[in-house]
């Protein structure tokens, strides 16, 4: 199973091209972005496509690696039927992702700007100099 699905997790040159366009803001305000991106991708030169393919080979996300590791570990348990293993893998992966989201939200809430404290300290230092 995993031998076939690993290629589905890999980043394609086309997806890299889309993310590059999105980062530069060229997709904003376009009514049909898929059509626009497809047209632009087909217009790329061979050198540009080769560069994208090279970047795509090197691209790997931590989530892909973590999922592969978890899938390998879960699927190696041969005493459980394959459908059950898939269900367990899906359930555990969703729980992991949910826990990560909650952790990120908590960290985001805790982080506050130090701007007001810096301003107060600057005012105190100005007053003490006078």
Curated annotation (Swiss-Prot):
- The region called Disordered is annotated at 89-130
Q: Where is the composition biased (Basic and acidic residues)?
A: 92-105
* Chief location: mitochondrion
Instruction: State the compartments where it is located.
Output: Mitochondrion matrix, Kinetoplast
Which stretches are transmembrane? none
List the record's Gene Ontology CC terms alphabetically: kinetoplast
Q: Which domain of life is it from?
A: Eukaryota
The record's listing under InterPro entries reads: HMG_box_dom, HMG_box_dom_sf, Kinetoplast-DNA-binding
Assigned keywords, A-Z: DNA-binding, Kinetoplast, Mitochondrion
Residues forming the propeptide are 1-10
Q: Name one GO molecular function term.
A: DNA binding
Show the ranges annotated as biased composition (Basic residues).
106-130
Give the similarity note. Belongs to the KAP family.
PANTHER family to which the protein is assigned, alphabetical = DNA-ASSOCIATED PROTEIN, PUTATIVE-RELATED (PTHR37564:SF4), KINETOPLAST DNA-ASSOCIATED PROTEIN (PTHR37564)
Instruction: Give the record's subunit note.
Output: Associates with the kinetoplast DNA network.
Protein role = Histone H1-like DNA-binding protein involved in the organization and segregation of kinetoplast DNA (kDNA). The mitochondrial DNA of kinetoplastid protozoa consists of about 5,000 minicircles and 20 to 30 maxicircles. These circular DNAs are held together by catenation into a highly organized compact disk structure referred to as a kinetoplast DNA (kDNA) network. Binds preferentially to a specific fragment of minicircle DNA and is able to compact kDNA networks through DNA charge neutralization and condensation.
Name of this chain's protein: kinetoplast-associated protein 2-1
């Amino acid at each position: 199973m995993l031998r076939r699905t690993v290629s589905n997790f890999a980043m394609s040159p086309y997806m890299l091209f889309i993310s590059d366009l999105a980062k530069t803001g060229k997709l904003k305000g376009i009514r049909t972005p898929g059509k626009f991106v497809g047209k632009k991708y087909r217009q790329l030169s061979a050198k540009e496509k080769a560069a994208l393919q090279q970047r795509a080979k090197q691209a790997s996300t931590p989530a892909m690696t973590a999922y592969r590791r978890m899938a390998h570990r879960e699927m190696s348990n041969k005493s459980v039927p394959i459908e059950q293993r898939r269900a367990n893998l899906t359930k555990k992966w969703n729980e992991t992702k949910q826990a990560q989201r909650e952790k990120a939200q908590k960290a985001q809430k805790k982080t506050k700007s130090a701007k007001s404290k810096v301003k107060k300290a600057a005012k105190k230092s100005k007053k003490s100099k006078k």
